[in-house]
Amino acid sequence: MPSIADQLSAVLGDAFASLELPRELGRVSPSKQKPEVFPFQCNGAMPAAKQAKTNPRELAAKLIEALHGIPQIGAAEIAGPGFINLRPAEHLYGERAAEIAGDDRAGAPLAAAPRTVMIDFGGPNVAKPMHVGHLRSSVLGDSLQRLFRFRGDTVVSDIHLGDWGLQMGHLITELHEEQPDLVYFDAAITDGYPSEPPVTIEDLARLYPQASVKAKAGPERLEISRSATAELQAGRPGYRALLRHFIDVSVAALKRDFGALGVHFDLWKGESDVDPLIPGLVEDFKARGVAEESEGALIVRVARDGDKKELAPLILVSKTGAALYGTTDLATILDRKQSVDPDLTLYVVDLAQGDHFEQVFRAAEKAGLAEEGALEHVKFGTVNGTDGKRLRTRDGGTFRLADLIASAIERADERLKEAGLAADVSAEEHARVARMVGLAAIKFADLQNYRTTNYVFDLDRFTSFEGKTGPYLLYAAVRVKSLMRRAAEAGVTPGEILVDAQEERDLVLCLDAFGAALDNAADNRAPNALCDHAFTLAQAFSKFYSACPVLVAEDDAVKASRLALAEATLKQLELCLGLLGLEAPERM
């Protein structure tokens, strides 16, 4: 059964078509004027009148006349210069609510044309602890993969590790300085290396900053790191063995961190995985005439007529013979084309990388690696401190993501105790609830903003159980769960939904809007649309619950009907929370 909004759009589209006007002009939207009387509005008569060269109100009157006797229409009126206000027929509320209540997807349709979607997000570097900058990519990318899967698309997510570049040369050089006798540094030994890594994640976290500082202090040390990087990429066995250890140690730590955040990846590939593809890719680009020599380097010109800003060529191979980040990204596109062949690839990376991805995408299209529009940069803004600058620690350092999560969970625990919540559960259960609340606080705070918006990190506000926050939504879900338990104890079961009160209608219309919120979120790669829907739904249920007693209703049929509405709300709210990567506890 289509949504109420879609049903009204269809019959109004028929009315436009009967007057030989475009059917799409019949699209209705939620009304902001008198929504309790006329919940929907159509503005199509305005452009249609211009097209038909007639008065908008006169045209609107003809459209309303064409709606007479249509069973989906309860009432219609002309407003202002030619807007059409609409009220659905009463029977639609109960019918639609019953469908949502009986549907595992809570009324959400599947995508009409499912696709294979690759989502590249996370992108941490080997040997570097994740920082606050990884929060947005991780949370946004995870929500998008959940959303596209829910809509019926085949989704493959890839972390795309940064494991191929100068940072590896830095690590090798610093480790050699500390432990020069390690077998990996003996050029005469080419196999039989130890299976146990010579470093821990703590060692890597220490070695890289040390090496970076030394490289910045003097060109000699930087040159040594570059030489080590070149030998690694040329295939020196000992260095390749070290790289494997660095990756294994880092991935084990990253899986713990991402697991704590509730974020999943299908693939754990890195830049180094596509290195074998680069020579063939370069030769193919040359053979196609896509790449050309310029000042000793091999470049791909990507500027186009009509560009509003200058876009430099992509350097495929530097004048020193090195493959650069753009080359690796192109090889990754080739690898994904061969292994997954996605219809769409989303790169969830901060907006500062916009020019880089524009170069890569244009080069890929020019070489026939991707169709135009099949590669998309899902850009996002920064997480800032109260000073409006990127969030930093008190000493000016980078805020580690693990510390951020720990702080959120600690503050959530304090909030629970202040509110007297989760007080009658075991210490273990209380800790689990605090973790759910803390993660909900930082995830929802990030996702509720449109992704390109910078936002200020404020734990006190994020962990509040009041207002538009993750903890508020979790508490709203827990309230409904509590109601369902008490109903079961009283022997009350959900029944046929009978919509009568205005608050019931408002709740049904909110439930009805789930599909539109999903479409909005998917089309714009913007989970904030789901955040808005979840919050609006929680508010609508709160008003319904206050105005329409459930368990104390005198009429058993009304009691069963309202319980069914509560159950449908819980189902949809939990689905929405799940798409955002949030989980509501059973009790709080």
Swiss-Prot record:
Specify one Pfam family.
Answer: Arg_tRNA_synt_N
An example of a Gene Ontology cellular component annotation for this protein is:
cytoplasm
* Motif 'HIGH' region in this chain: 124-134
Write out the catalysed reaction.
tRNA(Arg) + L-arginine + ATP = L-arginyl-tRNA(Arg) + AMP + diphosphate
Q: Which PANTHER family match?
A: ARGININE--TRNA LIGASE, CYTOPLASMIC, ARGINYL-TRNA SYNTHETASE
- Subunit details for this protein? Monomer.
Q: What is this protein called?
A: Arginine--tRNA ligase
Organism of origin is: Maricaulis maris (strain MCS10)
What gene name is listed for this protein? argS
